[in-house]
Amino acid sequence: MIQTASTISSNGGTNQGMESSSANSPEMNGTQNSMSVGMSGSGSSQNRKITQFSNKLYNMVNDSSTDSLIRWSDRGDSFLVIGHEDFAKLVLPRYFKHNNFSSFVRQLNMYGFHKVPHIQQGVLQSDSPNELLEFANPNFQRDQPELLCLVTRKKAGSQPVEESNTSLDMSTISSELQNIRIQQMNLSNELSRIQVDNAALWQENMENRERQRRHQETIDKILRFLASVYLDGKQKPPSKVMPKSRRLLLEAKYPTVSPTNEPSAHSRPSPQGTTANSSSASISSLHNTTPDGEGKYRSVQNGRALNYVSSFNSDSHSPKDYISQSYTNEPGLKKESADSFNNSIDSYISPNQSPNTDVPSLNRDDTTDPKVVNTGDIINMLDDANSIEGSNMNSLSPLLFDYPNSLYPVNNTSSEQHHNSYRGSVSNSQPSGNLSESTNLQPVQPVDYMSNSNPSYGSYNAEDQLTNFHPGYAMDQKRISKLSDGITKQDQNIQALADILGIPLGDGKIDDAGFSANSPTNLNLPVSSDLDSVLNIPPNEDVFPDSNPVFDEFTNISNLTSPIEASNGNTFGSNPVSLPNQQKSVNPSLMTVSSPRQVRKKRKSSIGA
């Protein structure tokens, strides 16, 4: 007799079984109805149905007469099928309406059974002639028929779980898209702030350059005042007189030679008169000549250069001719020494070209004693010879004042570029090695330091100033525009993707104040969406006010000592400007400066006293 799982009640937690007909009876024939099974759970009974397939399978495995074809495993948590062909022919038709073993395996898979693999299944030749198959289910165990109600068929019950997962995925995608859109807006806002800050920085740079130009003009006025102090008796253009602080530099840079056998300053003239040679006559005339009235600031040293400067009053010859005549006619001096000195005068103080600062080397073989020529002698000599014109004074100004490189370079013609030399460079015509390697001087820039011809930015509006004088501003704006366009396209792609998925995206607005406060790139610059308002920021006059008393004092003095042509006009001469990488040419006629405001009345100071 085969005991079947007929009815299991939950009264007292005990199971009651009922006997059924024999397995060989025709009533069994795989048509038993499923019976209700009650399970105990926390004091409340719950009725569940046992499926027909699980009931038939349990009876089939428990039948001891078919143990040669199907039986329980040793552990009782699975069953074994031995010889599936014989099992399909002899056992399956008794419980099911078919004898197809493949259909039986498919039903097992539908009810949650899985095949247990064995080692012998992977070999070519097994030990047993019949193939052994094992199937297991966690709820299908020996002597536990109460678990059969848990053996259910896989239905569409798992679909709600999948739908919930799908809905969860859609919500996740929606939140992620919203976060991406917020990040895109953050980047767009940050780029806008960077663009405004960049424009503000460029504008501040322009203001600083304009302020530096004004400082340069003030320094020029101060230098004119200081130069007027050294005028010897008559009103001369202050640009032709060198400050005293720079004379010492030229005294060290331009040494000359004096003969060792130089006669005394108190020596008497040669009694031979006309019978003496030309050289002694020249020396005698030089020694007997007294300095002129205008030689107030000339050197008091006794030397050939001093005597020459004191006695030189002719405009018919250049300084080179007189120096050559004085030195070549002197007995005991070599002609090559005079030639070297002529070359040095020609190449270093020639008014026709930019000054060369290579120091000439002295001929050590000469029997000469090197002495330093006073800087005032050189300048007064050139002044008396009228060899320095107003246009050529600018080429000498780097020597006199030794300014650093200007921030406003001018256009150089081919001839000017040819004459532009570098300080400390070795020339083919001049000996090298006289300038120490530690002296790292900058190249001479042909900048007009003694005139107010530096370019003015005041005649341009803010946008034109940034475009004309700062090509990097346009490049920065172009790069920022490309980044902004890329972010806009990404935002459009995100919106299109959200529309395809049917996900509504919010505006994603950000608190600008909070973002600006927490932003690490906040430079405390003016934050504004209006670019024009930033570009039109008025310059800060607190740094260098026009009402500075020292500035006004020097302005008054400079106006008194400046040349007439430099103080009358409000517009300076045309000076074509060529800034690095400048794309647009600047019209020199636009380079005008607004008329300076009225200088306030000169206050009483100790300078006039």
Swiss-Prot record:
Protein's recorded name:
Heat shock factor protein
Q: Where is the composition biased (Basic residues)?
A: 598-609
Per its UniProt record, what InterPro entries does this chain match? HSF_DNA-bd, WH-like_DNA-bd_sf, WH_DNA-bd_sf
Annotated Gene3D superfamilies: Winged helix-like DNA-binding domain superfamily/Winged helix DNA-binding domain
Presence of keyword Mitochondrion: no
From what organism does this protein derive?
Schizosaccharomyces pombe (strain 972 / ATCC 24843) (Fission yeast)
* DNA-binding region(s), chain positions: 50-156
Q: Which residues carry this modification: Phosphoserine?
A: 350
PANTHER family according to UniProt? HEAT SHOCK FACTOR PROTEIN (PTHR10015:SF427), HEAT SHOCK TRANSCRIPTION FACTOR (PTHR10015)
Q: In what ranges is there compositional bias, type Polar residues?
A: 1-33, 257-277, 339-360, 422-443, 567-597
Where does the signal peptide begin and end?
Answer: none
Tell me the name of the encoding gene. hsf1
Query: Which spans does this entry mark as compositional bias, Low complexity?
Result: 34-45
List UniProt keywords, sorted A-Z.
Answer: Activator, DNA-binding, Nucleus, Phosphoprotein, Stress response, Transcription, Transcription regulation
Q: Which family does it belong to?
A: Belongs to the HSF family.
One Pfam family from the record? HSF_DNA-bind
> Which parts of this chain are annotated as the region Disordered?
1-47, 255-298, 310-371, 411-445, 567-609
Function as written in the Swiss-Prot or TrEMBL entry: DNA-binding protein that specifically binds heat shock promoter elements (HSE) and activates transcription. Also required for growth at normal temperatures.
Q: Name one GO biological process term.
A: positive regulation of transcription by RNA polymerase II
Q: Name one GO molecular function term.
A: DNA-binding transcription factor activity, RNA polymerase II-specific
Q: How does it assemble?
A: Homotrimer.
Q: Where does the protein end up?
A: Nucleus
One GO CC term, this protein: chromatin
Note whether Phosphoprotein occurs among the keywords. yes
